[in-house]
Amino acid sequence: FDMGGTSTDVGLVRDGEIERTTEAEIGGHPIHVPMVAVETIGAGGGSIARVDEGGAVRVGPQSAGAEPGPACYGRGGTDPTVTDASLLLGYLGTDTTLGEDLDLEVGPAKAAFERLLPDTDLDDPVAAARGVYRVATERMARAVRKVTVREGHDPRGFALVAFGGAGPMHATALAERLDIRSVRVPRANGVLSALGLLAAPLRNDASRTIREPLDGIDPEAVEERYERLLEQVRGEMGSPGGVTTTRQADLRYAGQSHELTVEIGAPFSPARAAERFHAAHERARGYRLPEESIEVVTIRVDTTGSADGPDISHEGERSEPTGYREAFFGGEFRETPVYRRDRLPSGTDIDGPAILEGGESTVVVGPDWSGTVDERGTLEVSR
């Protein structure tokens, strides 16, 4: 769950593997290339709240951006945003410094929500902020359901990994909305995507479309095609150490418009490919059709090299709160401890409600959540 300033991206990791797809849509255009399966919505910390003609509160996709940014930045922004709502609810503080030199101002944030009130039946900017926060959380919940429930997975069986500059501020509230009982917030979560880019192993894919019925395919001809693909990716990858290669195929039942990518092993066996596809289809869609014929749409070779990730070991020296402030939980404002996350040593226990502030993000831990900081600085909380 990656929430930034203008958008939120959600993906699924199942059995240690990130879900991938060969079908996506960008700007209304279908894209058919291998990619990580990500559901994106236009809701982030800078997303602007408004009231539509029917009186319903909407959040995004319009964004205040970085300039002028949310009203609380004090840079001339006048529209109410999700970040402004978080400030009025106490999740961010006026003593919170974002980046190196940006101090938040509650006055402009309050004024922005006051301008929203005439279009609602509310008379309190804090009540409007609560509504905006709830609407934003529900939009994110719908995105999570699209990558879980819609694909036949129960989100209650997963942990929510929250990152991005704004993600950890909504993580436990989002988890409660989905009845998820475990949340993990990695260290350096505000720049985790950039860190992942640097640490990710080199990967190269090659594919060939064949579109043939599985029960009539020539296994030897398929093997020859796989060998040519292997030669191609090996030439492009060079000779890095620790290279692993897998053979895959995009398969579907006859008449379907979507495929599933299945690892089929070597040498190519139609019977093994069929059984793995039936099992994959049942996991992904909830059913199998053993009497239906299967089509081989594309064969693929996936080559991954090793990568030396950065050292992200963690040391801290202070486990006590640095202060307290009033924050909104359970229908009321409550005195809430505030911690400096980068100073928390591994093994520190955290009981909600609590707020953990760091250089690039803020973590909000709701009531009934508790957990600890592990040796890498990851915060793991559950309820």
Spell out what each predicted region is.
Residues 5, 44, 53-54, 59, ...:
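C-terminal, non-catalytic interaction/recognition modules in large multi-subunit enzymes and RNPs
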Residues 9, 37, 361:
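Conserved beta-strand and immediately adjacent loop positions that scaffold enzyme active sites
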Residues 1-14, 47-50, 172:
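Gly/Thr-rich phosphate-binding beta-strand-loop-beta motif of the actin/hexokinase/Hsp70
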Residues 1-2, 38-40, 184:
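Short glycine-aspartate micro-motif
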